[in-house]
Amino acid sequence: MYKNLIIFAMALFLTLGASAQNKREFRGAWIQCVNGQFMGKSTQQIQSMLSKQLDELEKDGVNAIIFQVRAECDALYESQLEPWSKFLTGIQGQAPNPYWDPLAWMVEQCHKRGMEIHAWINPYRAKHGSTSMSQVSKNSVVVKQPKLCFSYDNLVLLNPGLQESADYVCKVAADIVSRYDVDGFHIDDYFYPYPVAGKQIPDQALFQQNSHGYWNIGDWRRDNVSRFVKQLGETIHHIKPWVKFGVSPFGIYRNKRNDPNGSETNGLQNFDDLYADVLLWVNNGWIDYCVPQLYWEIGHKAADYKTLITWWNKHAGKRPLFIGEDIERTAKFADPANPRSHQLPAKHKLHQQMQNVKGTVLWYAQTAADNVGNIGHTLRDFYWKYPALPPLMTFLDNKSPKAVRSLKLKWTEQGPMLNWKAPKGKKWGDVANRFVVYQFKEGEPVDLNDASKIIKITYDSNVKVPYIKDGKTTYIVTALDRVGNESKGKKKKIKF
């Protein structure tokens, strides 16, 4: 009896917390390749595994996938610039057999489920620590252009101090963005290497040769990375202005002991250790969204989650702020205020309290799909029960598309189907990219701000609707442009 009361109380708590969901929210999940989940599997097995992940993530309410397509200057897509990834086929430079293009396939699969897809690259890493030099392809930049690289511990990296390195990465990015219908382009937290005790970055001579006027090597390194980030964003937007450029930095910018404006934390720092001045990029508008990786728990002694989400909310609000969440750690640790619960309810509450936090990215997709700690099902049943539109990015485009045309009900073998035509538009900002379908039962007020009335967000121009026997049902369909601006609604009343 007591156990049942606890379960009831927990469900009631979650239900109350989910009663007012955000209509716009980034709900992402990272799908990585470096964990080896694709290695040793056939094309069919990989596609089956990814399909199952995407199906579960769609049920969980995820609306964006961040898919790793470049781990070590390699490719999980057809490329003339870099070799096929060993994390796909087991051998760097070897094409998949049977042949397929994972990025092209993922674009199709994500859009079929109404999800955005963001292509994720590691910008500087040229050889992963798990890859031996004998495994490096002759077509790798490590072999073809070794002067662009330096070794550090068991890694090989493109040298951020060389403009040729920035140009090389931007060329790769331009190739991806121009050939694939991606909604976003994403780089992770690996800039200058994570420091290893007793190891020095071998760029002293380069600094002395070309310091760009800096006296301090740390300032010079930060400038190298910042100029690259700015160039990369400009490269992407020159080709496709609607592609969202995002960064997922390490979770601590600076500790307060190093900077009065830093966080009350004691850990590795973006600014000082990775030479990544993330706030400069945010405040100058060089990136379109920021996803600090806050993988710690509430109550962590060195890097408390509550301290960090509050800090990022205060300092990084000039661009949409999403929070990187570690599912396994969230499930592992109890809520300090409610020891019978994992930390998802408390973290969700913090998200709702932060004005500048516009979404979440789950680390990592497989753990959500496997429902580790019941996190995935909690999202689908409570916090992400209804679909969500992407956060607005008015700095990219602030004009809504025109309304959909010719909204009609048709009967098909699958049952009743709503069909419509996309609005006409000549410029990219006027073209409809997705559609939102709202359903209002008889007597319900028609309110497009009510997220609970969204039944589908789709890239298609049709949607199957349920057969409702009694009363009239009102459907409203709106169009979204490439950035997510929403049109006025087109209404259709139906009585079966």
Task: Report residues per predicted region.
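Active-site-adjacent "subsite" loops/lids of carbohydrate-active enzymes
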Residues: 24, 32, 36-48, 119, ...
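Catalytic domains of carbohydrate-active enzymes, especially glycoside hydrolases
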Residues: 48-75, 179-183, 280, 286
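Aromatic- and acidic-residue-enriched segments that line the glycan-binding/catalytic groove
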Residues: 75-90, 125-152, 189-212, 256-268
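Active-site neighborhood of glycoside hydrolase catalytic domains
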Residues: 164-172, 178-187, 191-294, 299-318, ...
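Substrate-binding cleft of secreted/luminal carbohydrate-active enzymes
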Residues: 275-301, 317-395
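Pro/Thr/Ser/Gly-rich low-complexity, intrinsically disordered linker/stalk tracts
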Residues: 374-429, 484-496
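Solvent-exposed loop/turn segments flanking beta-strands in beta-repeat/beta-sandwich domains
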Residues: 423-450
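Beta-strand-rich modules
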Residues: 465-487
